[in-house]
């Protein structure tokens, strides 16, 4: 082993890094493109987490500050009716999908969303000059509303996106904190599921554990866990399955500065200020927090209702939809308008206005539509490829019915001929085990596209976008030497005939320029 030893120090070579194969190294493209899209997907419900029971049914919580996570099921291309049966050899390779383009469309008008609390923990207005206070009352909570942090998030992968949040940590046994002291906190990770709350300007935390007053936050998140996408972990993921790409826009500014009620147990040191004269002890709080605001909502900065083309994913997986699954994670509170519904509380005709005769409800509605451009690819079953897939995602080989460990032949089993005959023992009442869903314990919006793929790109808006530019792009296409992208994908696009190749390259390069 080579080493360098200056003086008494010994320096060994660094530990080699385990290399992960890029999907471009073992994926062979077939130059066949399919289009798939969903119907108009609608949802409506109450903006709060309160369960309202009507005739043994529950009105779901539908808030603009929730994530929408779509789990898209694609057909198995190995059982697909292909236009050419000689495209692949089933004994030596398997077919997979690679996502080339995606468009997440949203309906409904833009509107700022307003959240608040009927009993908000605000003691003093700290942004303006406040009077001196010698004591706090028992309860001086106030009604407060605000337009929260504005954000749009779009993430695409073949596994669920990962979110992070802070929560209470288990204290050390030898150093258990006293009652009323600040607990230790830790960062935890979890899959972002459909219906999880976004950060709206108050941080990503488990407010079920950290909001004991139930008055420090808007009602929307007062008893929820707010997740923030863990971009650091997903970009460093070796396989690159959780996030092919992401787009986001966040904006927030401080609208008000308040101080909360409560006993401040972490007072600033006396060396930082001079005490007031006399024996009177002032109770001016030293804890401040901001009321966020998302400001203007405009169509100029919308991430949705436009196509995204994947020429090079950020990770080692360049858009391959393993297990024929895609996860689309959407967060958007720019369409946060709520419908205020008033109904009379009885059947009597109304002749004059009386507030006591009306019931007031609020509903929030959302509208989505997904569209994809998929390319047919094949994976050659070489030892290197099988070993790499077994290490990164073993479920791929299980779904392909590839067993790396042959069954043991030394065990003698009994097989009865007439197993259904009364003269033979009862057959084992054990049904064949079905493949387990690794995400069965998680909540997603299930989308089935197994019977909705089409080769006729010109019959769909996203497909026509690829085909509509016919004779205007020759002089606009950039040269390969000026850009960095996978060699296989470049050669693939050079083999695609006609305008499909032209438009894919043009749109991808224009997004990167």
From Swiss-Prot:
Keywords: Capsid protein, Disulfide bond, Host nucleus, Host-virus interaction, Late protein, T=7 icosahedral capsid protein, Viral attachment to host cell, Viral penetration into host cytoplasm, Virion, Virus endocytosis by host, Virus entry into host cell
One GO cellular component term noted in the UniProt record for this chain: T=7 icosahedral viral capsid
Gene Ontology molecular-function annotations: structural molecule activity
Residues spanning the signal sequence: none
Main location: virion
Subcellular location: Virion; Host nucleus
InterPro entries on file: Capsid_L1_Papillomavir (IPR002210), Capsid_L1_sf_Papillomavir (IPR036973), dsDNA_vir_gr_I_capsid (IPR011222)
GO biological process, one term: endocytosis involved in viral entry into host cell
UniProt xrefs under Pfam families: Late_protein_L1
Keyword Lyase: no
Subunit and partners: Self-assembles into homopentamers. The capsid has an icosahedral symmetry and consists of 72 capsomers, with each capsomer being a pentamer of L1. Interacts with the minor capsid protein L2; this interaction is necessary for viral genome encapsidation. Interacts with protein E2; this interaction enhances E2-dependent replication and transcription activation.
Family according to the record: Belongs to the papillomaviridae L1 protein family.
Function per UniProt: Forms an icosahedral capsid with a T=7 symmetry and a 50 nm diameter. The capsid is composed of 72 pentamers linked to each other by disulfide bonds and associated with L2 proteins. Binds to heparan sulfate proteoglycans on cell surface of basal layer keratinocytes to provide initial virion attachment. This binding mediates a conformational change in the virus capsid that facilitates efficient infection. The virion enters the host cell via endocytosis. During virus trafficking, L1 protein dissociates from the viral DNA and the genomic DNA is released to the host nucleus.
Protein name: Major capsid protein L1
Source species of the chain: Odocoileus virginianus papillomavirus 1
